[in-house]
């Protein structure tokens, strides 16, 4: 089923309601990181260029639903957009019963979570939102995995529901990486716990040629291989699960490589002294915080031979430089690769920034939870809604 794209529609004189992900950090009334706002600008500008009267909505932070709280107001976002766009931008606080908006103007709705029923995808609220527009545009990949009134319900009731350019780009990039990838397909999955990424690991292990695990997740696989992990973070109750994943990978001709050398310390702190050890020499009081240089080189070789790379999660505690060399080497290998690469997840994007490889990654996903759910093979509620409306 085809999804309607905003870029294909005639929007002249139309009231267009765009759901963006404008959930940005704010301090003292000022936006402190504008990445999501910058990402949304081309969609808003395209709607204006097509002659639309533009309304934009988003959540910001986690206010108590149904209650106004100035701390979570969209006003700082409005101030930012007013400078970034060459047109009038204003905040609408009371909009559910109708809002005046002229062609060439942008009205930003107050935080959608101030509306009772937003998170539960309340039908009455969804219908009120839908009545405000001629065209609803879902452009917030970061919230596409949530079935809420502003991301899902409104689209079911609006006259037309379509995907914005940012969402369309995300789906195209993820489809290119997972549905029809250039092989070998290599996935790097890091993070602290196997339990939070278990479904991702299971889903990917069935489609990738090589699965690489890092961070705390790797510790559970190290333990599953029979090595001591000392006081490292790992999940003893998931050792059998890790063994099963390795056996599955090997039955398909792949593997989940375990590090041969690791970087350990006696405590978790920015000043902890790093010690390099072979994986079979980890002591009872050691904590594993990174992979060693031999392991990093082995992973870099795997990445060099890849046709497609999916990266979700660092392989060490890269926030502390003495435990960042493994992630740095992985980042460099991805940057040097000619393969199609996609990176997603908050920690991953922080590593991309730290090692300055943003322009060397083919596509950087804006979604955290949505990116993970896509990797799990789930259909995102917003995508299901857009397919339904495009049919």
Swiss-Prot record:
Entry GO terms, CC: cytosol
Subunit structure, interactors included: Monomer.
HAMAP family: Phosphoglyc_kinase
Residues reported to bind substrate: 21-23, 36, 59-62, 113, 146
InterPro entries: Phosphoglycerate_kinase, Phosphoglycerate_kinase_CS, Phosphoglycerate_kinase_N, Phosphoglycerate_kinase_sf
Lineage of the organism: Bacteria, Pseudomonadati, Pseudomonadota, Gammaproteobacteria, Alteromonadales
EC category: transferase
Name of the molecule in the record: Phosphoglycerate kinase
Family that this chain belongs to: Belongs to the phosphoglycerate kinase family.
A GO MF term: ATP binding
Cited PANTHER family: PHOSPHOGLYCERATE KINASE (PTHR11406), PHOSPHOGLYCERATE KINASE 1, CHLOROPLASTIC-RELATED (PTHR11406:SF23)
Reactions mediated catalytically: (2R)-3-phosphoglycerate + ATP = (2R)-3-phospho-glyceroyl phosphate + ADP
Domain of life: Bacteria
One GO BP: glycolytic process
Pathway(s) the chain acts in: Carbohydrate degradation; glycolysis; pyruvate from D-glyceraldehyde 3-phosphate: step 2/5
Binding residues annotated for ATP, in chain numbering: 197, 319, 345-348
Record's keyword terms, sorted: ATP-binding, Cytoplasm, Glycolysis, Kinase, Nucleotide-binding, Transferase
Location of the protein in the cell: Cytoplasm
E.C. no: 2.7.2.3
